From Swiss-Prot:
GO cellular component: cytoplasm
Organism this protein belongs to: Bacillus thuringiensis subsp. konkukian (strain 97-27)
Role noted for this protein: Cell wall formation. Adds enolpyruvyl to UDP-N-acetylglucosamine.
Pfam families: EPSP_synthase (PF00275)
Subcellular location: Cytoplasm
Binding-site positions, phosphoenolpyruvate: 22-23
Enzyme Commission number(s) from the entry: 2.5.1.7
GO BP: any one term: peptidoglycan biosynthetic process
Protein name (record): UDP-N-acetylglucosamine 1-carboxyvinyltransferase 1
């Protein structure tokens, strides 16, 4: 088993560059299935386990995929298979994003029910509601969801009960090849939605209104391969903003888009963090003393749920009582118990977490419960006394490229080790003293 070992006490300083956005690239790779003519070439693609997984899904569906030098080339011009099996989908719930493109291209899709981070039920009912509105019949059973349409999908007016990012992306992709116009209301407004729409339009789609609550998609007969560069990862940028603030450091985060970080910036400035927009990105300077604040996660442009656990680590160092309320996902507080292992004064009350600070955290062996919790525990380790050992790094690898190396380059005392290697080293040390 691999683990990351971090020793607290260092101020982080320097420059770090964020990768392309994980939450943008996965639905974009899935949407590449819509192009029945030509190749799609995607640049600024992060080297993440989730990207390898979605690439394998596409290969299983009979697309040709080449991933090298942060570029993915996809040729989906051959006849596609209709089924994405459990062996792939169980690893990552974003695999369900191939359903809309398959339904639009083939008139049928059969997808194993998704996996991914264990943060609540995260149902796909809004995806299926959209497909049904466009004329598809949907069946769920035996661990699969199957959708099929006789003839072709038809444009429809669809209202989402909640501005689900995944549902917005899946329905938007499916609607590009539907007959007629689809109007999607109460749509998600995240920057990743806009990036997907830009990619679809580059392929020849007619998508308007992405980034607003109402998206209009006029169906076309065919989509073609295109070139597209993935937007920077705002969650990775936010994570390094916290790294600067929590250590009282000074970090320039390159390839960050300030407009995508407004809600994070606002809360951190409330806490006393200095944030400067520069041509290269965002510079973050941590204060000597952090102020307590309250945060409520909301759909974009509200505070992102994917930054909740990292901000929790930061608020543990703030002076006073802070509260975080999670409104987007249920069961996203599993990392609270791990913070307690580090001597944090923190408790759960319903859908909120209350923290009293500042905390004198102590290094401990902790387990990452999901992707963002993994980063949060490492951030907490940066300011803990002694050594913090973080396990279950498979979660971290789903969303961060060389996270420990980037932190080390900023001055952190951190390394990633194989448990067996560590045991051998410890044995060698004990042998020397025998």
């Amino acid at each position: 088993m691999e683990k990351i070992i971090v020793r607290g006490g260092k101020r982080l300083n320097g420059t770090v560059r964020v990768e392309g956005a994980k939450n943008a690239v996965l639905p974009i790779i899935a949407a590449a299935l819509l192009a029945s003519d030509g190749k799609n070439v995607l640049s600024e693609v992060p080297v993440l386990s989730d990207v390898y997984t979605i690439n394998e899904v596409l290969r299983h569906l009979n697309a040709e995929v080449v991933f090298e030098n942060n570029q993915v080339t996809i040729d989906a011009s051959k006849e596609l298979n209709i089924e994405a099996p459990f062996e792939y989908v169980r690893k990552m719930r974003a695999s369900v994003q191939v359903m809309g493109p398959l339904l639009a291209r083939n008139g049928r899709a059969r997808i194993a029910l998704p996996g991914g981070c264990a943060i609540g039920s995260r149902p796909i009912d809004q995806h299926l509601k959209g497909f049904e509105a466009m004329g598809a019949k949907v069946q769920v059973g035996n661990g699969f969801v199957e959708a099929y349409v006789e003839g072709e999908l038809k444009g429809a007016k669809i209202y989402l009960d909640f501005p689900s990012v995944g549902a917005t992306e899946n329905i938007m992709s499916a609607a590009t090849l539907a007959k007629g116009t689809t109007i999607l209301e109460n749509a998600a407004k995240e920057p990743e939605i806009v990036d997907l729409a830009n990619f679809l339009n580059a392929m020849g789609a007619k998508v308007r209104g992405a980034g607003t609550g109402t998206i209009r998609i006029e169906g076309v007969d065919k989509l073609y391969g295109a070139n597209h560069s993935i937007i920077p990862d705002r969650i990775e940028a936010g994570t390094f903003m916290v790294a600067a603030a929590i250590t009282g450091g000074d970090i320039l985060i390159e390839n960050a888009v300030p407009e995508h970080l407004r809600s994070i910036t606002a809360k951190m400035e409330e806490m006393g963090v200095k944030i400067i927009e520069e041509n290269e990105g965002v510079r973050v300077i941590g204060p000597d003393k952090l102020k307590a604040v309250d945060i409520k996660t909301m759909p974009h442009p509200g505070f992102p749920t994917d930054m909740q656990s990292q901000m929790m680590a930061l608020l543990l160092q703030a002076d006073g009582t802070s509260m975080i309320t999670e409104t987007v996902f249920e069961n996203r507080f599993m990392h609270v118990e791990e913070f307690r292992r580090m001597n944090a004064d923190i408790k759960i009350e319903g859908r909120s977490v209350i923290m009293n600070g500042p905390n004198s955290l102590q290094g401990a062996e902790v387990s990452a419960t999901d992707l963002r919790a993994a980063a949060a525990l490492i951030l907490a380790g940066l300011v803990s006394e002694g050594y913090t050992r973080v396990t279950e790094l498979k979660h971290l690898d789903r969303g961060y490229v060389d996270f420990h190396k980037k932190l080390a380059a900023l001055g952190a005392t951190i390394e990633r080790v194989n448990e067996k290697v560590e045991e051998v080293k410890e044995q060698e040390v004990s042998d020397l003293h025998a």
